[in-house]
């Protein structure tokens, strides 16, 4: 049997990467490495130890000391911090309020990249983000670059917010925000959003989630056959 592959899914904000990555991981019984959850776990550890999230030096020390693991769960993926399950704790409002400050520390990003590589070492993993195929897992045999028009991404986010009962700005405002985020992501100095030369570009503007999952699944199966 072919060993599980490393699957890297990159793309701009609101392209549906996480939704698709989770479904693909479930389909192949792979681990989904939620990179955002890792930064939340660091934030939780920082708060639990009574450290100021704005104290870059101490925050970086915590990031280097902790160990984060993922395990597939029935309903959602389980997250562990130093062996203790924190799946729900990392979603607490106090964590959400401080995660941006923690994630902005360069030493934290460096450490998380290192841990993400360790998690992916044995394969059988799906990871999504902005720089997975270019920076975190440049050797991944499957690299997908998911794109969709700014209007379509804004429309999806707008519909999602309405379904969740979240008060949101107009569709036009959402589109402007997404276009601004695209510009920031693609022009930042550290790990900018760019398509890896060997990544397969997938324009999902006119595709359903099921169609995207099906397309990526075909790519994974084809790669498995080639490497078998």
Swiss-Prot record:
<feature type="binding site">
    <location>
        <begin position="11"/>
        <end position="19"/>
    </location>
    <ligand>
        <name>ATP</name>
    </ligand>
</feature>
<keyword id="KW-0418">Kinase</keyword>
<keyword id="KW-0963">Cytoplasm</keyword>
<protein>
    <recommendedName>
        <fullName>Cytidylate kinase</fullName>
        <ecNumber>2.7.4.25</ecNumber>
    </recommendedName>
</protein>
<dbReference type="GO" id="GO:0005829">
    <property type="term" value="C:cytosol"/>
</dbReference>
<comment type="similarity">
    <text>Belongs to the cytidylate kinase family. Type 1 subfamily.</text>
</comment>
<dbReference type="InterPro" id="IPR011994">
    <property type="entry name" value="Cytidylate_kinase_dom"/>
</dbReference>
<keyword id="KW-0808">Transferase</keyword>
<dbReference type="GO" id="GO:0006220">
    <property type="term" value="P:pyrimidine nucleotide metabolic process"/>
</dbReference>
<dbReference type="InterPro" id="IPR027417">
    <property type="entry name" value="P-loop_NTPase"/>
</dbReference>
<dbReference type="GO" id="GO:0015949">
    <property type="term" value="P:nucleobase-containing small molecule interconversion"/>
</dbReference>
<keyword id="KW-0067">ATP-binding</keyword>
<dbReference type="Pfam" id="PF02224">
    <property type="entry name" value="Cytidylate_kin"/>
</dbReference>
<dbReference type="GO" id="GO:0036431">
    <property type="term" value="F:dCMP kinase activity"/>
</dbReference>
<dbReference type="GO" id="GO:0036430">
    <property type="term" value="F:CMP kinase activity"/>
</dbReference>
<dbReference type="GO" id="GO:0005524">
    <property type="term" value="F:ATP binding"/>
</dbReference>
<dbReference type="InterPro" id="IPR003136">
    <property type="entry name" value="Cytidylate_kin"/>
</dbReference>
<keyword id="KW-0547">Nucleotide-binding</keyword>
